[in-house]
Every structure is written in C-alpha cells, then in structure tokens.
Design a protein with these regions (language model features):
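An extended, acidic
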Residues: 1-116
C-alpha cells in the first residue's frame, strides 16, 4: 500500500510530494524538479506524455517490480541514480501487494533545490 511504500522511502529522502496528475509528476521527473516517482493502477493516457518526457530527458522507467513499463498499471520513474534504488526498496512490498491497490508518490532527495 501507499503507506507501506512511504514508510520505506521517508527515512532515505528529503521529502515526498504528490502533484495530483501522473503526467505532471512525470514532467517534474523529466525536468529534474523531483528525482523519482511511483504510482500503481494507472491507465495508458495517464502517463503517455510524461513517460516520453522522462525517457527523452534520460530518466529510467519501469514497473514498480522493475519490469518493462507497458503504458498502464504500475510505474516507477526516476533519475538513473534513484530509479534502481526505488525498485529495490519497493521489491518486498510490491511482491505482497494485493491486485488493484492504488498508490502514488514523488521523491525529493536531500540535494533537491526545488522549493517545498
């Protein structure tokens, strides 16, 4: 669940934010405003534009399990440095996650200069 994922990342990051739209959160990753983003239970139109922005900016995309992102369902996006750490941190949780649970969050690391 979101709270379990949040408990895993909070001790390791400067903050977690949620803009409210997957496309905007992904655009923030692409622009470098946030370092990472995850969400469960998305539809293809939620992420099509944002996923392209992340890819073109040199970011990494996958499912939260680390598999190839398929434009819907779960997504994990981030800078190359953060992405693999997010997938590894979430691995024990997503393996036990019930189907259909929705969760979201964006990550800011301690080095993030964006305003709170």
């Amino acid at each position: 669940t979101y709270m379990q994922m949040l408990r895993v990342v909070m001790p390791q990051v400067a903050g977690v934010r949620r803009a409210g739209a997957a496309a905007l959160d992904l655009a923030y990753v692409a622009a470098g405003r946030v370092d990472g983003y995850w969400e469960l239970g998305l539809l293809p139109w939620d992420t099509a534009a944002g996923a392209l922005l992340v890819t073109e900016a040199g970011g990494h995309l996958s499912t939260v399990h680390g598999g190839e992102y398929q434009h819907g369902g779960d997504i994990c996006a981030g800078t190359p440095r953060i992405h693999s750490a997010m997938v590894a941190a979430f691995a024990p949780l997503v393996a036990a996650r019930p189907v259909g649970v929705k969760s979201a969050g964006t990550l800011r690391t301690a080095g993030d200069k964006a305003n709170a």
